[in-house]
Curated annotation (Swiss-Prot):
GO biological process: translation
Similarity-based family: Belongs to the bacterial ribosomal protein bL19 family.
Record carries keyword Ribonucleoprotein: yes
UniProt source species: Clostridium kluyveri (strain ATCC 8527 / DSM 555 / NBRC 12016 / NCIMB 10680 / K1)
Any GO CC annotation of this UniProt entry: cytosolic large ribosomal subunit
GO molecular function: structural constituent of ribosome
Superkingdom of source: Bacteria
PANTHER family assigned to the protein according to its UniProt record, in alphabetical order: LARGE RIBOSOMAL SUBUNIT PROTEIN BL19M, RIBOSOMAL PROTEIN L19
Coiled coil: none
Assigned keywords, A-Z: Ribonucleoprotein, Ribosomal protein
Protein name: Large ribosomal subunit protein bL19
Function: This protein is located at the 30S-50S ribosomal subunit interface and may play a role in the structure and function of the aminoacyl-tRNA binding site.
């Protein structure tokens, strides 16, 4: 039974997206439909968490816009995501970065992995 589910789900898993981890700064290009028009909106921020796996995998991106923290959760395999760009690789020691919600300014920064 599980093999059948995995086989069906494998058809919907996207392979065109880059590998990104928690703590990375990413630009998510989201397709938005307004009436009969479509446009692409870019949401840039730090990846706070990744949840689940397979087709149901989601990730949450946080940014501070005009002094207000904004978090958006995206399904990884959703067709509304046009592309994901990794801007910076972050070095973190946690799987969930909820502590960044309480931090302001430089304290909310994540160390960058230098190549």
């Amino acid at each position: 039974m599980l093999d059948i589910i995995k086989q069906i789900e494998s058809q919907y898993i996207r392979t065109d997206l880059p590998n990104f981890n928690i703590g990375d700064t990413v630009k998510v290009h989201v397709r938005i439909k307004e009436g009969n028009r479509q446009r692409v909106q870019v949401f840039e921020g730090i990846v706070l968490k990744r949840q689940n796996g397979g087709v149901r995998e989601t990730f949450t991106v946080r940014r501070v816009a005009y002094g207000v923290g904004v978090e958006r959760t995206f399904p990884v395999n959703a067709p509304i995501i046009e592309k994901i760009q990794v801007v910076r690789r972050g070095k973190v020691r946690r799987a969930k970065l909820y502590y960044l919600r309480d931090r302001v300014g430089k304290a909310a920064k994540v160390k960058e992995i230098l190549k």
